From Swiss-Prot:
UniProt KW Cytoplasm keyword: yes
Keywords: Cytoplasm, Hydrolase, Nucleotide metabolism
Record localization: Cytoplasm
Keyword Ubl conjugation: no
Descriptive protein name: 7-methyl-GTP pyrophosphatase
Protein EC: 3.6.1.-
Organism: Shewanella frigidimarina (strain NCIMB 400)
Swiss-Prot/TrEMBL catalytic activity: N(7)-methyl-GTP + H2O = N(7)-methyl-GMP + diphosphate + H(+)
Gene Ontology MF annotations: nucleoside triphosphate diphosphatase activity
Family indicated by similarity: Belongs to the Maf family. YceF subfamily.
Length: 206
């Protein structure tokens, strides 16, 4: 199967993860409203936003004679029943990590794969739980100053120094924490007829 693969994200972290599959791909920036709907659950939110990003990405690319397969992804974290997102500021990051100290946080990553040739959307939500150590204020401040995780849900980068914050990780795919669960992605691509191992050499790039 020949296809063009598109990542509907400009996140360097998601790009680095997708590169592990050794498939050429292009990136587009889906500009969508990410405001939660009233009473929307974390699972419903990330699934909806992942699908909207994939559809928005499809609208940003030129039509071609080969199928375009667009990947959308979104992530939120849930602690004590409350959705938390990206901190954006140092103070917010410190507050998030202070709340997480000694607690368990579940991350929900919505993943959507859209084939514009047949208009088929396949999506799922992948959970992953991190169990935090009891952290002192000094440790939290040191970490935030060192790694500046201001654009990461939950205020940490597990691929870096953030790994020192945890007692235990619990889930099927640690890539979920970085924003793109590769095991599930491979499964969704296969449902679109894309076999990563046997068909990767046949794919093309815009």
């Amino acid at each position: 199967m020949k296809f063009n693969l598109v990542l509907a994200s400009t996140s360097p972290f998601r790009q680095q993860l997708l590169q592990k599959l050794m498939l050429p791909f292009t990136c587009v920036n889906p500009d969508i409203d990410e405001t939660p709907i009233k009473d929307e659950t974390a699972l419903a939110l990330v699934k909806r936003l992942a699908e909207q990003k994939a559809l928005a990405g499809a609208n940003l690319i030129d039509e071609t004679s080969v199928p375009q397969i667009i990947i959308g992804s979104d992530q939120v974290a849930l602690i004590n029943g409350q959705i938390i997102g990206k901190p954006y500021t140092v103070d917010n990051a410190i507050a998030q990590l202070s709340s997480a100290s000694g607690q368990s946080i579940t991350f929900y990553t919505g993943l959507a794969v859209f084939n514009n040739a047949n208009q088929q959307m396949i999506s799922c939500v992948e959970p992953f739980t991190v169990h935090f150590k009891h952290l002192s204020t000094a440790q939290i401040r040191y970490y935030v100053d060192a790694e500046q995780p201001l654009y990461c849900a939950g205020s940490f980068k597990c691929e870096g120094l953030g790994i020192a914050l945890f007692n235990r990780l619990e889930g099927d795919d640690p890539n979920s924490l970085i924003g793109l669960p590769l095991i599930k992605l491979i499964d969704l691509l296969s449902q679109h007829g894309v076999d990563i191992l046997s068909q990767a050499p046949e794919c093309s790039i815009n």
